Design a protein with these regions (language model features):
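Phosphate/NTP-binding elements of NTP-utilizing enzymes
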Residues: 2-189
Length: 189
């Protein structure tokens, strides 16, 4: 039996508001609405995001949804290099989209990024190194900053090398990245 097609988009089943198309805002709304359980600091970050969408302009803040989407979409061009997901495209989870999108989507009125640093705390084996490697590669080649420099720092060289090694493997798995990034001893340029 053929399904009827409606010329207008369906209403949001949760009410009259149209569901946000931006994954950053959708995640923030889900947290604030209690659809996703989160800690106090995550809830506050999501509340801040939603409030700043309304009144951020008065404080000199601009939401650049296209920049957020560009950063999030970049990760789809990367591949996992180890573990059960090896070889699969890197699809960001909602919380990861919120982090990456917030970092690159929020700008000051002078169009410079609002956030220069981020503190992300998650349990072991939850993809911190992969997320950081992808973010580093984005900053290196896709953020549009001429002559960008990206550093991997940690308390030990071995720890810093984990993120570098992950980025290196991501480059090796992508012919598009290989054409833009050259590996030298302990460097990706």
């Amino acid at each position: 039996m053929a399904e009827k097609r409606n010329s207008r988009p369906p209403r949001n089943p949760g009410g009259g508001r149209k569901a946000p198309s931006c994954p950053v805002t959708a995640y923030a709304r889900a947290i604030v609405d209690g659809k996703i359980v989160a800690g106090r600091l995550v809830r506050l970050a999501c509340e801040r995001h939603l409030a700043d969408l309304k009144v951020g302009v008065k404080r000199g803040l601009v939401w650049d949804g296209a920049a957020a989407r560009h950063a999030i979409d970049f990760f789809g061009h990367l591949r996992h290099s180890t573990g059960e997901w090896a070889g699969e495209p890197f699809v960001l989870q909602g919380w990861q989209q919120f982090v990456v999108g917030s970092l690159y989507g929020w700008k000051r009125k002078d169009r410079l990024r609002r956030f220069r640093t981020a503190y992300v705390e998650v349990a072991r084996k939850n993809g911190k190194s992969v997320l950081l490697a992808g973010t580093a590669l984005y900053a290196l080649i896709a953020d549009g900053e001429p002559g960008a420099h990206v550093y991997s720092a940690a308390t030990t060289r071995d720890q810093a090398r984990i993120v570098f090694g992950e980025a290196e493997r991501m480059v090796a798995a992508s012919s598009a990245l290989q054409s833009r990034i050259t590996r030298t001893v302990n460097n990706l340029a």
